[in-house]
C-alpha cells in the first residue's frame, strides 16, 4: 500500500516537472521559468515527511538557545567515520588523511629522521635521538645554540651522519658559558663632556668663573 502511494506521488511529481508546472510552495523568484534543484529537494522532503520516511528537522530559534538544559553534544565532526550529509543523507563525506606538503604518510625504514626530535619517537632511538636529557627551557636553548655551532665534518671527520649524542657529550664536558650580569660600558671613568639626553648638565669646578 505504501509503495503504491509512493509510486503514485512520484509519478505525479514527474508529470508536474515534465509539464513545467511549479507548485505554489516550491516557487523560486530567481527561476520563474524552470524548477530548481532546491525546489525539487524541498518537495521530495515534504513527500517523505508525509509518508513518515524522513524525520522532520528540529530547529531552535536564537532566543531559545539559552533555554537548553542538560548536557549537549554535537556529532558529525571530522574523522568520525563515514557520514552522509545533506537534507536527505545522500551526500557521502570523504575521510581524508591529514598530511602536510613535506610529510610522508608513513615513516618506513628508508624514511628516517635527519634530525630526530626529543623525546624519541617509537623505533628511532638508535638514530641519534636523546632519551635522558633535561626537560628544561635552559637546556633546550643551550642545545640549539651548540647545534648551530657544531660542525661534524670538522669536529668528527670520521662521522658521516649527524649524531646528537656526541654533541650532548661535548656540552657536558665543556665549560658552560657564563652569563654576563655587568654592563662593561658602565665601568671605568665617566666622561664629563658626554651629556645624556634630558639630563642635568654637570660643570666641573675648573669651569666655574672666579669670583
From Swiss-Prot:
Subcellular location: Secreted
Signal peptide feature range: 1-26
Residue pairs linked by disulfide bridges in the UniProt entry: 120-129
Pfam families (UniProt xref): Secretogranin_V
Phosphoserine: residues carrying this PTM: 140, 204
Major location category of this protein: secreted
Sorted UniProt keywords: Chaperone, Cleavage on pair of basic residues, Disulfide bond, Neuropeptide, Phosphoprotein, Secreted, Signal, Sulfation, Transport
Keyword Chaperone: yes
Any coiled-coil regions, as ranges: none
Family classification: Belongs to the 7B2 family.
Protein name: Neuroendocrine protein 7B2
Organism: Pan troglodytes
Classification lineage: Eukaryota, Metazoa, Chordata, Craniata, Vertebrata
Gene field: SCG5
Amino acid at each position: 500500500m505504501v509503495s503504491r502511494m509512493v509510486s503514485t506521488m512520484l509519478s505525479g511529481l514527474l508529470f508536474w516537472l515534465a509539464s513545467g508546472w511549479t507548485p505554489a510552495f516550491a516557487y523560486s523568484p530567481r527561476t520563474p521559468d524552470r524548477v530548481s534543484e532546491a525546489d525539487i529537494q524541498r518537495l521530495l522532503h515534504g513527500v517523505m515527511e508525509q509518508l513518515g520516511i524522513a524525520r522532520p528537522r528540529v530547529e531552535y530559534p536564537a532566543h531559545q538557545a539559552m533555554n537548553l538544559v542538560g548536557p549537549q553534544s554535537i556529532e558529525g565532526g571530522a574523522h568520525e567515520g563515514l557520514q552522509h550529509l545533506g537534507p536527505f543523507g545522500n551526500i557521502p563525506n570523504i575521510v581524508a588523511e591529514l598530511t602536510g606538503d613535506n610529510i610522508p604518510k608513513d615513516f618506513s625504514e628508508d624514511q628516517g629522521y635527519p634530525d630526530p626530535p626529543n623525546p624519541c619517537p617509537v623505533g628511532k632511538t638508535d638514530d641519534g635521538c636523546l632519551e635522558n636529557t633535561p626537560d628544561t627551557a635552559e637546556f633546550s636553548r643551550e642545545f640549539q645554540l651548540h647545534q648551530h655551532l657544531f660542525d661534524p665534518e670538522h669536529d668528527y671527520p670520521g662521522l658521516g651522519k649527524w649524531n646528537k649524542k656526541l654533541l650532548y657529550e661535548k656540552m657536558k664536558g665543556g665549560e658552560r658559558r657564563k652569563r654576563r650580569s655587568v654592563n662593561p660600558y658602565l665601568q671605568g671613568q665617566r666622561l664629563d663632556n658626554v651629556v645624556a639626553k634630558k639630563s642635568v648638565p654637570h660643570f666641573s669646578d675648573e669651569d666655574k668663573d672666579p669670583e
